[in-house]
Amino acid sequence: MQTTDVAILVPAFNPAQGWSRQLLDEWECFRKELGDMSWSFILVNDGTTTADFEQELSYLLSEEPSIQIIQQPVNLGKGAALRKAMELARANIYLLTDIDFPYTTESMLRIINELHNGSGADITAGNRKKDYYKKVPWLRSQLSLFLRWLIRKRLHLPFDDTQCGLKAMNEKGRKIFLQTKTNRYLYDLELMVRAVAEKNITIKPVPVQLREGILLRRMSFRILFQEATNFMKILLFRNRL
């Protein structure tokens, strides 16, 4: 695969109806801001079961045939999907985001420019402001805040917002990402724990903001139980370092 300036990596699992048009609209805005930077775009279908997904995917590719598709027949989780994309991608900067491009174009540019402009960062991680939690379901916001507290008190990381879905990294960051084992949502946390343990990796939090009108999903109790188990695994891994 040809090396590009930026690779955009996006997982997809049962996205909302009309996702393809929304993705194209947001992608068009972002692509214009990339200017003359070369890009690649990889979308991973992580075992989607909705009836209209293939139809929407066909429309997406008819409008933007350069997007590469990875098909996973069963749902393995966001972390597993992004690792699959990361294995295929070749770029100077790898940008991770969600299928609805929930963060503003300015936020995405800020994330990659901190790497592109030679700030010394290897991984840039979105840092969500307090008003973010007013825009998400109550239970999800409380769980996110509780996780941030746990990260400060139990994992002792230099920053507590590990779960923002908007991140970017260079090749050094990519190599650490490919070492992660967590398949679902807490892959971010494992990535940060591994990166902090490396002496030659620099992580920079970057302020980001949600787009207006974004509605985030509620989490099922099954997923919450799985993530609690994953947190304990990551905690044990951290304690062994």
PLM feature spans:
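Short aromatic/hydrophobic "clamp" motif used to bind/position activated sugar donors
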Residues: 94
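Conserved donor nucleotide-binding strand/loop of the catalytic core
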Residues: 54-88
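Short beta-strand/loop segment that forms part of the nucleotide-sugar
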Residues: 35-48, 68-72
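Hydrophobic helical membrane-anchoring modules
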Residues: 1-6, 10, 17-18, 32, ...
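Acceptor/aglycone-binding surface of glycosyltransferases and processive sugar-polymer synthases
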Residues: 74, 80-88, 105-178, 185, ...
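Short, acidic, metal-binding catalytic loop of nucleotide-sugar glycosyltransferases
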Residues: 25-37
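Active-site beta-to-alpha loop of glycosyltransferases that engages the nucleotide-sugar donor
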Residues: 10-26, 47
